[in-house]
């Protein structure tokens, strides 16, 4: 963080991927001491995993599921916000009304996915993490404007603000 703060440009956008990403991001930002830089912790990996589970349940192409927001850190306590997804012109509330599936299948599956991958493979999925990092960068640089809502933990005032970001909010004007 200190090196980025001292040598990085003032309009730098820093994406922290290594877990615990939110904590690492906070430490990096505090060490950087450059309030002009934008520090984000990646939540896109969990967002992509949640979209994958939903795409199977809804029989939809994963690319049709938009606005998947993850609240919290990459852990069993995170909350994938299925209610506010958009598929076509329908919200998650309209599409998913099976509360038992949400509570018994969807939430545990998404919340425990990282552990399941490690238990199965003996390591985390570097490819999935790399794709999620690329997806986050693309979302930050998107020209879709206000309709481009994506998930990231944005560091503000030395704390984590779990928020859904609009791409134009990550750009310095």
Model-derived features with residue positions:
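Short, flexible active-site-adjacent loop segments at beta-strand->alpha-helix junctions, enriched
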Residues: 20-21, 74, 171
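Conserved small/polar residues in nucleotide/adenosyl-binding loops
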Residues: 163-172
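Mobile gating loops/cap/lid regions near enzyme active sites that modulate substrate access
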Residues: 52-162
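A generic signature of intrinsically disordered, low-complexity regions enriched in glycine/proline
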Residues: 26, 172-173
């Amino acid at each position: 963080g200190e090196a980025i703060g001292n040598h990085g440009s003032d309009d730098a956008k820093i994406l922290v991927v290594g877990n615990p990403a939110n904590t690492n991001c906070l430490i990096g930002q505090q060490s950087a001491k450059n309030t002009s830089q934008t520090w984000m912790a990646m939540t896109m990996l969990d967002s992509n995993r949640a979209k994958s589970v939903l795409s199977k349940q809804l029989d939809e192409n994963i690319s049709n599921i938009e606005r998947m927001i993850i609240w919290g850190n990459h852990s069993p306590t995170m909350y994938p916000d299925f209610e506010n997804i958009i598929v076509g012109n329908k919200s998650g509330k309209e599409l998913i009304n099976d509360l038992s599936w949400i509570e018994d299948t969807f939430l545990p599956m998404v919340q425990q996915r990282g552990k399941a991958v490690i238990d199965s493979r003996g390591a985390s999925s570097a490819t999935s993490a790399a794709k999620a990092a690329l997806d986050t960068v693309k979302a930050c640089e998107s020209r879709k404007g206000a309709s481009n809502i994506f998930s990231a933990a944005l560091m503000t005032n030395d704390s984590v603000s779990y928020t859904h970001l609009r791409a134009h909010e990550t750009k310095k004007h």
